[in-house]
C-alpha cells in the first residue's frame, strides 16, 4: 500500500467561500456530481474515451508518456456552445517548455461530448467561476483529456513544473489512478509562502483553482510493478478574455 497525503476536502456548500478565501477548493466525487446535478455513475459513461487518446507529439523532453485529446467551447447564458476544433496555445510566460507555439491535438470524440454528464459538468464549473466573477458573461473553455503512463519508466503530469495556465480558473478532475505511486498535487500561493500537498485519489474528485492566485503542479508517477500504470485526468480551463492565442 502506498501512503497518500489526503486531499483537503471542502463541503459543497463551502465551495465558493473556499475559492474566494484561498484561491482553490477540493471536492469529493459525490459533491462534484451534486454540483453538476447528475448521478455519480453518469460520469462513468465518459470513461471509455480515455482508452482512445492520442500520443502527445509535442513533448520536448523526448517522452512518450502523455496521451491526450482536446476540445473547446463557449459558455454563455447557461448554454454550452461548441466551437470548431482549434489549436491549443500558451505563452512562454506560462509554459516555458511548450509555450509560444500552436499545438494541435486530436479532438475529443463527439460521442464523449454528447454524454449528458459532459455539458452538465462544464455548466456547473462555469457557474462556480461566475459566482467568483459575476461581471463575466461568456467563458471560453478548453477541455483536455490526459493519460500519463509509465511506458518510459516515469510519467510526468506537468513536465513544465509548477505553473499557472494564463486563464481565470482551472479545474482538474482525477479520472483514474492505476498501479502507480506519485502523482501528488501541489498548490502554492502565487504571492506568499503558503502551499499544500495532497493526492487526488477518488475518481471524479475535483481541484478548482483561481489561476491568478495559485500555481500548481503534479509530481511524476512511477509504476507499482512491471506491468506499468497510468493516471487519467480531465482538465478544464475557463477564461473570460477569449481563447489564448487569438
Task: Label every model-predicted segment.
Residues 1-92:
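N-terminal auxiliary "cap/dimerization" subdomain that precedes the catalytic jelly-roll/cupin core
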Residues 30, 75-78, 144-146, 174, ...:
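Structured loops at beta-to-helix junctions and adjacent beta-edge loops in soluble globular domains
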Residues 33, 149, 177, 215, ...:
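Short loop/turn segments at secondary-structure transitions that flank enzyme active sites
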Residues 76-142:
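Signature of the catalytic double-stranded beta-helix
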Amino acid at each position: 500500500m502506498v501512503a497518500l497525503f489526503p486531499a483537503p476536502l471542502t463541503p459543497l456548500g463551502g465551495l465558493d467561500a473556499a475559492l474566494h478565501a484561498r484561491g482553490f477548493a477540493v471536492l469529493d466525487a459525490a459533491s462534484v456530481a451534486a454540483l453538476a446535478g447528475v448521478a455519480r455513475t453518469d460520469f462513468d459513461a465518459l470513461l471509455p474515451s480515455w482508452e482512445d487518446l492520442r500520443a502527445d507529439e509535442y513533448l520536448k523532453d523526448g517522452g512518450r508518456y502523455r496521451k491526450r485529446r482536446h476540445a473547446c467551447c463557449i459558455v454563455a447564458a447557461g448554454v454550452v456552445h461548441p466551437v470548431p476544433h482549434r489549436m491549443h496555445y500558451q505563452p512562454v510566460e506560462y509554459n516555458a517548455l511548450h509555450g509560444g507555439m500552436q499545438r494541435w491535438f486530436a479532438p475529443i470524440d463527439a460521442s464523449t461530448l454528447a454524454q449528458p454528464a459532459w455539458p452538465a459538468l462544464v455548466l456547473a464549473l462555469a457557474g462556480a467561476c461566475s459566482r467568483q466573477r459575476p461581471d463575466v458573461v461568456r467563458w471560453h473553455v478548453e477541455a483536455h483529456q490526459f493519460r500519463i503512463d509509465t511506458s518510459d519508466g516515469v510519467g510526468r503530469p506537468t513536465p513544465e513544473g509548477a505553473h499557472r495556465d494564463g486563464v481565470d480558473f482551472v479545474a482538474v478532475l482525477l479520472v483514474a489512478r492505476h498501479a502507480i505511486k506519485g502523482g501528488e498535487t501541489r498548490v502554492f500561493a502565487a504571492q506568499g509562502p503558503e502551499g499544500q500537498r495532497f493526492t487526488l485519489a477518488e475518481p471524479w474528485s475535483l481541484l478548482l483553482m483561481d489561476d491568478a492566485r495559485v500555481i500548481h503542479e503534479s509530481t511524476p508517477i512511477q509504476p507499482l510493478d512491471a506491468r506499468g500504470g497510468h493516471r487519467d485526468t480531465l482538465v478544464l480551463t475557463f477564461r473570460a478574455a477569449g481563447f489564448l492565442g487569438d
